[in-house]
A protein has these predicted regions:
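Exposed, low-structure sequence patches enriched in small/polar residues
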Residues: 1-195
Length: 195
């Protein structure tokens, strides 16, 4: 951590990172059910490296985070299906492991405002994956949360508000209830809001 004086307050710069060498989790290696069955004992260990820097200015409650990830031997679930008259048919789930390196760049800008009981928190994130078929992410993601914070009878804290999310078009992962996991898919691209 480094701290700098700026306009009567402190600007802090933090750098961190990690290196993980992990076996793919149990369900990537073994799964037995009525509709899917696999035993993958020969999967390679995943290597995940992250370097990130965080610049934070307390006076304006502004944070800038820049991160770079590299993932080797990335394991993931993939689903495929055919849409026939609005129904999904020929649904198949596979476990895949990408043998190359996947690079992910993330730049996130956070800004928080408070005016009496009114609070507004916003985050704008830019992400770029060099392999969107294996690790799909939206290019831009915006999150905003507007709420009022107050106390009832000076003891009960209350937060009342709403949040909104927007992201650019991408192939969002599908949820598979049989596995209880998200799977990569290339059938339906999604974008827009979720509030």
């Amino acid at each position: 951590d480094l701290n700098f004086k700026l306009f009567g307050d402190t600007l802090s710069l933090t750098a961190n990172g990690f290196f993980h060498r992990l076996n793919p989790t149990f369900y990537y290696r073994h799964y037995h059910s009525r509709h899917a069955w696999w035993d993958n004992n020969s999967m390679s260990k995943m290597l995940h490296t992250r370097l990130q820097g965080i610049l934070h200015y307390q006076k304006t409650r502004t944070t800038l985070r820049i991160g770079i990830d590299e993932i080797n031997n990335y394991a993931y679930f993939a689903s495929s299906y055919t849409v026939n008259n609005g129904n999904r048919v020929n649904h198949a789930i596979t476990v895949n492991q990408y043998g190359g390196a996947i690079n992910l760049i993330t730049v996130a800008l956070s800004q928080d405002f408070t005016l009496g009981p009114l609070n507004w928190e916003s985050v704008i994130t830019y992400q770029k994956s060099n392999n969107k078929t294996v690790l799909p992410v939206p290019d831009f993601n915006i999150y905003s949360n507007l709420y009022i914070k107050f106390k009832i009878a000076r003891v009960l804290s209350c937060d009342f508000g709403a949040d909104v999310r927007y992201f650019t078009k991408y192939f969002a992962p599908d949820y598979n209830p049989g596995l209880g996991q998200y799977t990569v898919q290339t059938n339906t691209a999604t974008d827009g809001t979720d509030s």
